[in-house]
Amino acid sequence: LKTSAIIGPNGAGKSSFVRALEAVKGIVFASEDIQNPLRKYLAKSAFAYGDGKTRPCEISMDILLDKGEAGNEDKPSIIARYTIKATQERFYEESLYYIINGSKKVMFERKWEDGEYVYRFGKFYRGEKKRQVAKLPEDRSFLQGAALKGGQTALEVYSWLDAKQDVLTLGYGANAEKVILDSLKAHPEWSDQIVSFLWALDVTDIFRIQVIRNDKGLETVGISHCFVNAKGTEAYGQTFMNESLSLRRLILIAVSFFEAFSKEKIIVIDDFGQLLHPYVLTHIVEIFHANDMESQLIVVDCNPALLQKDLMRKDSIWFAEKGEESSTEFVSLSDFRGIKAKQSIYDGYLQGIFGALPIESDFCFQNKVKENN
């Protein structure tokens, strides 16, 4: 799938998907100076409590490592399934399986049983075992430890997470500007590409974006605008943080797309359509589709504009809503049967056919101060 979307009302828990991806990457890549990676990346996360705050949560992800070649047994498809089950104090389970041409093979399993870890390694596992097991703390990932020791199997998944999974920041503040600064310094030729990207979205008054230094001597993103008046065409410049929130977000999306257009990446964007016009939103998706690099865009949003006809495949759209116990339930659009080819998914969603709509009720502000007087 080139693109995929999770759509639902505010407060439905859509973003828990993104937070889980961030948590896994944070735990696996935690530096040595972080005393307890589990507490740092699972604390205050709604998905992390399982059936209670003291019981482990479980996160599992499938990673396509190799598409393989159909009919060629020497080049099978390989899907890595990495799973963690942990509280903020320790791992209770950690496992890596490879699904090779549909056949599930264990690489490693780590389980907490009777106060100690029990390990199991498959015959296809390549890497250090006994010494790595003996030294591993309860709050550290075996995948990380094995990869840093050069373990071939662990390194395949570790390298994929490092190089290909990218969760985009919201796109407004200093973190977003740093991403853009780093991209422009590494790829100065992208400056003109960003301008062209903005022009494609009808932002036509910008003619230059570059790295400059502000009054304090610090690097910042400088944006040059032009305008027409009675004297002719004139120009003025602004820094990134003085631009509108929507323009900052578009520039960040542009550089993240360029990364994905240059090498295979998985871009995950939360609140994708925030501050963006629906037409701009859909055209951004079309721009991503038009590129031939085998990268993937996964977005989370409230905006039903993503349901416009022929924008995304049915099996790439998921709806999110709160269940009876306030847990988030995800349902694929492809699970709904009887949808006619000519039927508008967009209209059907707004009519409530697929659920995942906000349930509204009346609200009346109670001015208690006035009532008491």
Show the residue positions of the predicted features.
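Conserved lysine of the Walker
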Residues: 14
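C-terminal lobe/lid and adjacent interdomain/linker elements of RecA-like ASCE P-loop ATPase modules
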Residues: 263, 283-373
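The conserved Walker
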Residues: 10
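Electropositive, glycine-dotted interaction segments
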Residues: 72-210
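Conserved ABC ATPase signature
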Residues: 4-7, 213-258, 262, 266, ...
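Extended helical coiled-coil dimerization/tether regions that scaffold
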Residues: 174-242, 362-372
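Conserved P-loop NTP-binding catalytic core
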Residues: 1-5, 19-88
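Short alpha-helix of the ABC ATPase nucleotide-binding domain corresponding to the H-loop/switch region
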Residues: 277-282
